[in-house]
Amino acid sequence: MRMGKIAVGYGFLLLLVFQLGVRASTLFNKYNVQELSSLKDLLERLEEKLSPGEESDVYAGSEDLVNDPEEDADLILDNVRKQAEKEFYKPAGFRDENLQRGRLRSIATSARSMNGCFGNRIERIGSWSSLGCNNSRFGSKKRIF
């Protein structure tokens, strides 16, 4: 009986909180609508002030630009040089980390390339067979002491 009263009380509080939340959000939404309408008015006034003749004045300097292929090539070379300098002048920690990654990758790939197998299986005590080996190349069974 006591649990029922507690559940009803919490349910009532939950309903009250939801109702207050809805009221707060509608007030908030009205405020946003008013703000949006004032921003639209400002935007329209700005567009009216800016005439089509003034728009061409803003971009008048763009006609003076000429695309020279030699200048473009020089810019590309400069960017490549800057990138190379950034790589060269990186802190030693970054370079060492990349070297370590490369060494680990080479170890992992070299073991696979030398052996050609990816695992072994014990058939019985003292007898091993290669699982992923090409049988014609490595034979069907390998004996390990």
Curated annotation (Swiss-Prot):
Keywords: Disulfide bond, Hormone, Secreted, Signal, Vasoactive. The keyword Secreted applies. The keyword Metal-binding does not apply. It holds the Pfam family ANP. Residues 1-24 form the signal peptide. Transmembrane segments: none annotated. The lineage of its organism: Eukaryota, Metazoa, Chordata, Craniata, Vertebrata. One of its GO terms (biological process) is neuropeptide signaling pathway. Disulfide bonds join 117-133. GO terms for molecular function: hormone activity; hormone receptor binding. Heart atrium and ventricle, and to a very low extent in brain. It comes from the Eukaryota. It comes from Acipenser transmontanus (White sturgeon). This is Ventricular natriuretic peptide. Its main location: secreted. Belongs to the natriuretic peptide family. Exhibits natriuretic and vasodepressor activity. PROSITE patterns: NATRIURETIC_PEPTIDE. It is found in: Secreted. GO terms for cellular component: cytoplasm; extracellular space.
